[in-house]
A protein has these predicted regions:
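Acidic/polar loop-and-plug regions of large Gram-negative outer-membrane beta-barrel proteins
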Residues: 1-20
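Outer-membrane beta-barrel pore domains
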Residues: 19-257
Length: 257
């Protein structure tokens, strides 16, 4: 196995004497922990995800950031006219990024989630983030929002609440999803006190606080074993994204092979 590959997968620093000690490749991801409890009527799943990217988590410098979730699953078989199958609550916080005045010092700068010093489009693929869609790329946000030219993700400091549910009402299946967020831009577009070392913070404008609501609703019905119909509606309202809505009518057919 090539030595460089071992350095990549372990995150160990590499130096051959001619170049400075660096980690090879990029190491972005999350550390997950979860607990599942199964009762007679409901199954409960609690989980927490922490970001890691530039090494701040090893110093507990961005331990405040992460995703907290609670999922409830109905374990009862029922013929009730109203039946919930799953319910989900999530809270996402990404404001810290090891850049708060009280954040423990680290060998690297703040995390600046999904942005990159060399890749103009950061950690994205075909214009979309490789992680949570709540961290906003430049092309999705309103054009009048302040942004630093080095940031492809112009909003990565946020507090968001998400709710989801699916079940049935009078024989019709339903899916509901809604996210509400307060968005604070990046450390380059804030006037908040910080320990990031950024020298031009606020030079390209102040992002302030932008609030956003995004919602999705689906009502579906199986007409028989093969044919299904669904009505779908989606809505964006707020000051981060442009206001928009859409209505869809979906028909599906399942083949038995």
């Amino acid at each position: 196995m090539p030595q460089n590959y071992l350095y990549v997968i372990t995150g160990k620093r590499f130096s051959n004497g001619d170049i400075q000690s660096e980690r090879l490749g990029n190491h972005s991801g999350s550390i997950d922990i979860g607990f599942e409890f199964e009762f007679k009527r409901v199954k409960v799943f609690l989980y927490r995800q922490n970001f890691y990217e530039a090494g701040a988590l090893a110093h507990f410098a961005n331990i405040q950031d992460g995703l907290n979730g609670l999922r409830l699953e109905n374990m009862q078989a029922t013929n009730d006219l109203v039946f919930w199958r799953r319910i989900l609550f999530e809270v996402l916080y990404t404001k810290n990024q090891a850049g708060e005045p009280w954040s423990p010092p680290t060998p690297t700068q703040c995390e600046n989630y999904y942005n990159h010093g060399q890749y103009f489009n950061g950690w994205s693929y075909q214009g979309n983030s490789l992680g949570t869609p709540l961290i906003t790329v430049r092309n999705d946000a309103r054009e009048d929002l302040p942004s630093h030219p080095r940031d492809y993700f112009i909003n990565n400091r946020l507090l968001a609440f998400h709710f989801g549910s699916e079940g049935s009402v009078h024989g019709y299946g339903y899916v509901v999803r809604a996210s509400w967020s307060k968005n604070f831009g990046t450390y380059r577009t804030t006037d908040e006190e910080q320990s990031t070392g950024i020298t031009d913070a606020g030079d390209y404008g102040i992002f302030n606080v932008q609030k956003q609501l995004s919602a999705y609703f689906e009502l579906n019905k199986h007409l028989n074993n093969s044919v299904g119909m669904a009505f779908i509606g989606a809505y964006d309202y707020g000051t981060l994204l442009y206001n928009s809505f859409g209505l869809f009518l979906k028909a599906s057919y399942s083949f038995n092979i």
